[in-house]
């Protein structure tokens, strides 16, 4: 059980923790520079992502521990904190997309069309891969039947687009 916990500790804190914060900071910075996101919203979401990483990153690890005999209440707590990790980047992507649609007719926006689409796609894939597909495979009953099936790589690979881009 200690080896399983240690393995998922590394995976969770590196992949789901650091990458989420990094992607949120980079997207927020670029969207602020392109005037698609105001600084206050960017700052709040980056701080929210950092707080979730620091406080919930450790607790979020518990959703990986199904086969090590962890009680269901602990796994549910971990799944809840893990699900919160996608919220800041999704909020940034949503606000940037909304502002992009409002300012889409301006000339400078046309020059940045594809980078903007890429960053918005990052937020979308993060929501779909880490959020939706991750939450589908996290409940204990789902882990009992689906662990190791194609739903696990589906979650991992779609979440990968949500960090590294499309």
Question: Which role does the model predict for each range below?
Answer:
Residues 2-10, 144-154:
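Juxtamembrane membrane-water interface segments that cap and precede transmembrane helices
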